[in-house]
């Protein structure tokens, strides 16, 4: 694996961690605290 490819993969993983984790945590938090039943 070339250094540029490994750097690209690490940046993609970092972006996923920075973006997806807070959004999923917020969705789980809202879904657990929101008591409105949706059909």
Curated annotation (Swiss-Prot):
Major localization class: plastid
Tell me the compartments it is located in. Plastid, Chloroplast thylakoid membrane
Q: What is this entry's stated membrane topology?
A: Single-pass membrane protein
Tell me which InterPro entries the record gives.
PSII_PsbX, PSII_PsbX_type_1_subfam
Q: Source species, please?
A: Emiliania huxleyi
User: What does the subunit section of this Swiss-Prot or TrEMBL entry state?
Assistant: PSII is composed of 1 copy each of membrane proteins PsbA, PsbB, PsbC, PsbD, PsbE, PsbF, PsbH, PsbI, PsbJ, PsbK, PsbL, PsbM, PsbT, PsbX, PsbY, PsbZ, Psb30/Ycf12, at least 3 peripheral proteins of the oxygen-evolving complex and a large number of cofactors. It forms dimeric complexes.
| Gene Ontology, cellular component aspect | chloroplast thylakoid membrane; photosystem II
UniProt KW keywords: Chloroplast, Membrane, Photosynthesis, Photosystem II, Plastid, Thylakoid, Transmembrane, Transmembrane helix
Q: Which family does it belong to?
A: Belongs to the PsbX family. Type 1 subfamily.
Q: Give the transmembrane region(s).
A: 12-32
Role of this protein? Involved in the binding and/or turnover of quinones at the Q(B) site of photosystem II (PSII). PSII is a light-driven water plastoquinone oxidoreductase, using light energy to abstract electrons from H(2)O, generating a proton gradient subsequently used for ATP formation.
Query: How is this protein named in the record?
Result: Photosystem II reaction center protein X
The yes or no answer to whether the keyword Transcription is present is: no
The Gene Ontology biological process terms listed for this entry are: photosynthesis
